[in-house]
Amino acid sequence: METTLFKPALWQIPHIGSGGETALAEKTETLKQRLHRIVGSHRDARFASSLAAEDMVITDLIAGENLNIGIFTLDTGLLHTETLNLLDRLGRAYPHLRIKRFRPVREDADRYVESKGRFAFYDSVEARRECCRIRKTEPLNRAIAGADAWLTGQRREQSATRTELPFAEYDAGRGIGKYNPIFDWSEHDVWAYILANNVPYNDLYRQGFPSIGCDPCTRPVKAGEDIRAGRWWWEGRNSKECGLHK
């Protein structure tokens, strides 16, 4: 008797039907205006791109509008091959853009591995947060040093901790303005823009990853699950942030 292995259906890129072009155009125009407002209000604004789908929308508009917003990403040293490949593709798609990479201090990362173990982040929330601090938070602080504003691709729909996310806020810990220009876009809006404008995106989205972080800390999500269920899945449901957005 043959045994058939059941494979659960995974999250998929939303199907985008016809008829929403006007609404998308209006949202896109609003997003453009927000980005222009940020540029007009700050001498040095920088966009922290995680290379997620929503970040690709913002990147495409920064390029298309020729906006004076610096773009950087955090290369944690633990990214998926697909994510690194996307960085190479972005260089070809937007040859006039320079996306800076910020990496962890090598000595700090090595010390963490030597003292705790290569996969210590699985052992406790504290150990995982320490890894995130070394590989994400500290490089972010260097990336925005000297800026007077930074931008994120956060959206209200992404998680329970972001439902009240505003367009503009003040990052008191770093003493600068912080903007979430795409905060009110839905997942459908994001993918409608990407597919309509042929914007590059991470190949992992086609493999059931709606939210993408470091390779050891991200896995595919089943259809119908919370989109961040694949992030740090071994922790509690309320522990789905890395500490960048305190």
Swiss-Prot record:
Pathway(s) annotated for this protein in UniProt: Sulfur metabolism; hydrogen sulfide biosynthesis; sulfite from sulfate
Cofactor(s) listed: [4Fe-4S] cluster
Source species, domain of life: Bacteria
Top-rank EC class of the record's enzyme: oxidoreductase
Transmembrane segments: none
Free-text function comment from the UniProt entry: Catalyzes the formation of sulfite from adenosine 5'-phosphosulfate (APS) using thioredoxin as an electron donor.
Chain sites annotated for binding [4Fe-4S] cluster: 131-132, 214, 217
Any one annotated GO CC term: cytoplasm
Family: Belongs to the PAPS reductase family. CysH subfamily.
Catalytic site positions: 242
Protein name: Adenosine 5'-phosphosulfate reductase
Pfam family, one: PAPS_reduct
GO molecular function, one term: metal ion binding
Protein location: Cytoplasm
Enzyme Commission code: 1.8.4.10
Cofactor note: Binds 1 [4Fe-4S] cluster per subunit.
Catalysed reactions, as listed in the record: [thioredoxin]-disulfide + sulfite + AMP + 2 H(+) = adenosine 5'-phosphosulfate + [thioredoxin]-dithiol
InterPro entries per the UniProt record, alphabetical: APS_reductase (IPR011798), PAPS/APS_Rdtase (IPR004511), PAPS_reduct_dom (IPR002500), Rossmann-like_a/b/a_fold (IPR014729)
Keyword entries, A-Z: Cytoplasm, Iron, Iron-sulfur, Metal-binding, Oxidoreductase
GO biological process, any: cysteine biosynthetic process
